[in-house]
Amino acid sequence: MASTIASYKQVMPAEEYDDETYADALTTAQSDGKIAADNGGASLISVVAAKDASGAETGYIVKGSAAGYGGSVIVVVGVDADLKVTGISFPETLPETAGLGQKATEPAFYEQFAGKGTKLSVKKGGGAGEDEIDAISGATITSTAVTNTVNAATEFVQDYILK
């Protein structure tokens, strides 16, 4: 549990984390299949409401996964009420190739997501625009898996929480 809370704090610091408020919305999203269909098969695992000291929601933390090159890539995504990504983290070791897909855990890659909105795409060769993420050279599959999971998280918050 300590590593889970640490991954939450990395993407969205809060006084309290509530994993019960949106459990029904998560079940609905998982069963209707729209989010997976819209985001390259990315799936949602859990959702947590981040709260301040007064109990007011400050954002949402969504844990999801998508198929990477070496296996399932699990990503924790912080999303604020303006549908901006506050950060991402990897709660488990990535099953990706060392020196390639493993570079997703380096700040040069994962810090690109902070402040971005919905419907991001992966751009090869650098020079990513506002709604784009620079792919890791030689690891486009991993880059796409992470981006699809982030997109699934923001779509879930938009369509099932803030609707």
Predicted stretch roles:
Residues 1-163:
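Flexible, solvent-exposed loop/hinge segments and secondary-structure transition points
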